[in-house]
């Protein structure tokens, strides 16, 4: 058994370290062994192991449909036996994404949101907490109350939650609440709920921390936040229809020659306003970073506009995206605690599209993006080039090395999209936005394809190959 576990972990490790050929060979060999098992020998563990190997083999073979379909079948068999395995459910959603079965993937992510929100009181201790998150959630609940989105009869309990979240945030800031310092990181500005006194933990659970609030249209057992959007309306809309066809040919050509393209007025006006409304009102910002909040697919970032955007982009940029499905996306919302934005990093994908959503009127200064010409080493694992730095000094050392290779700076502008090679290092420009919940800087990032998939990506191969000429191999030992 120990040998089987070690073999399984090695395949994943090789895959995540971009040793794709090695991971593929091992995954196929293990799949052949699993195929020899008869029905009586198959268990929940063998089903999920088969699913993972089929997923890895399918991904490394350019999203091979037969292998990915095999993965879906095996994930389904596993979940029939162990329905609450959130990791298996997440992998099922990611498999659907590789097959471009986006609607089914979004439904599975919605199921994950429901499962992850339905936790017991003794499980709250493992959640992260920070004053900026508490203030954000209080402000959002206040907005939802004012908009009439909270169910009738629940206003008083939500008002109590708002008051408690703000009081606890203030207490944490001034040190009035005892916190287990072993669980605290000043650099990342957050801690675990379990580091708080038992009374505070109990009150957080009572007031629904990190759970879905009682929204109208979100009934018992509801699987998503679709009540906050008109899904039927947006399914029929194209968020890019306002651009003439010639624009997309220019974008594709410029991407090949310059490796970075800026597109203004990217989303249609109604799609932009819909996403702004969604990020303001939807309780989806459940992931924390150093002073800012993230919303990923399993957090509820599954508005149908995102799916329609992915489909529309493939139609308009086939040379870039025909073989590069949407793999991951997120919203980042920067509170007043994060005036520096996100630190230097690269993202594990082929094509990155970053879209700024917050109106220009909210911006005082800064907020743009610097994209360095160097890319992450092919041999590096994701954690090597996408992580929170232990200190400002460590980040500055990397920045100085990257600047030697050159960079491009893009100024902030609402509804501006920046399209670039995803594993080029990039960093936010420090900024100041007006204070207030409605003025938080928000961006939507879409990642398409795999880092090493560009050999299958037609015209997109050329700029990525050029980027490799200035690889950051020397930045990581």
Where are these regions (language model features)?
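Short coil turns that delineate tetratricopeptide repeat
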Residues: 39-41, 83, 117
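Canonical positions in the second alpha-helix
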Residues: 30, 34-36, 77-78, 111-112
């Amino acid at each position: 058994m120990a040998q089987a576990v070690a073999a399984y972990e090695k395949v994943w490790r090789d895959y995540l370290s971009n040793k794709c050929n090695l991971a593929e060979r091992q995954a196929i060999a293990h799949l052949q062994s699993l195929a020899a098992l008869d029905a009586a020998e198959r268990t929940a563990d063998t089903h999920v192991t088969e699913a993972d190997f089929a997923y890895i083999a399918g991904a490394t073979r350019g999203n091979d449909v037969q292998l990915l379909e095999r993965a879906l079948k095996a994930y389904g068999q596993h979940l029939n036996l162990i329905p609450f395995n959130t990791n298996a459910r997440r992998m099922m959603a990611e498999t659907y994404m590789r097959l471009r079965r986006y609607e089914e993937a979004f439904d599975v992510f919605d199921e994950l949101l429901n499962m992850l929100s339905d936790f017991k009181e003794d499980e709250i201790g493992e959640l992260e907490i920070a004053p900026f998150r508490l203030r954000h959630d209080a402000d959002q609940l206040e907005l939802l109350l004012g908009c009439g989105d909270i169910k009738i009869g629940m206003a008083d309990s939500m008002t109590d939650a708002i008051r408690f979240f703000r009081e606890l945030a203030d207490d944490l800031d001034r040190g009035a609440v005892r916190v287990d310092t072993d669980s605290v990181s000043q650099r990342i500005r957050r801690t675990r709920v379990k580091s708080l006194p038992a009374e505070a933990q109990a009150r957080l659970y009572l007031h629904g921390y990190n759970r879905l609030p009682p929204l109208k249209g979100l009934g018992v057992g509801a699987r998503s936040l679709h009540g906050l959007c008109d899904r039927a309306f947006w399914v029929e809309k194209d968020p890019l229809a306002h651009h003439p066809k010639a624009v997309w040919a220019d974008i594709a050509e410029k991407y090949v020659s310059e490796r970075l393209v800026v597109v203004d007025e990217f989303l249609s006006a109604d799609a932009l306003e819909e996403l702004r409304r969604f990020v303001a009102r939807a309780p989806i910002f459940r992931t924390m970073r150093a002073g800012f909040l993230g919303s990923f697919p399993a957090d509820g970032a599954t508005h149908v506009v995102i799916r329609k955007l992915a489909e529309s982009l493939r139609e308009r940029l086939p040379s870039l995206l025909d073989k590069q499905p949407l793999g991951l996306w997120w919203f980042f919302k920067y509170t007043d605690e994060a005036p520096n934005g996100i630190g230097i990093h690269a993202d594990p994908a082929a094509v990155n599209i970053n879209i700024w959503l917050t109106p220009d009127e909210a911006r005082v200064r800064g907020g743009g993006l610097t994209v360095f010409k160097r890319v992450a080493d092919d041999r590096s694992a994701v954690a090597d080039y996408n992580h929170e730095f232990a200190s400002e000094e460590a980040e500055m050392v990397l920045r100085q090395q990257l600047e030697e290779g050159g960079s491009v700076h893009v100024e902030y502008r609402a509804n501006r999209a920046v399209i670039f090679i995803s594993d080029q290092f990039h960093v936010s420009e420090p900024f100041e936005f007006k204070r207030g919940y409605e003025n938080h800087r928000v961006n939507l990032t879409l990642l398409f394809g795999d880092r090493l998939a560009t050999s299958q990506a037609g015209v997109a191969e050329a700029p990525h190959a050029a980027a490799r000429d200035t690889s950051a191999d020397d930045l990581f030992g």
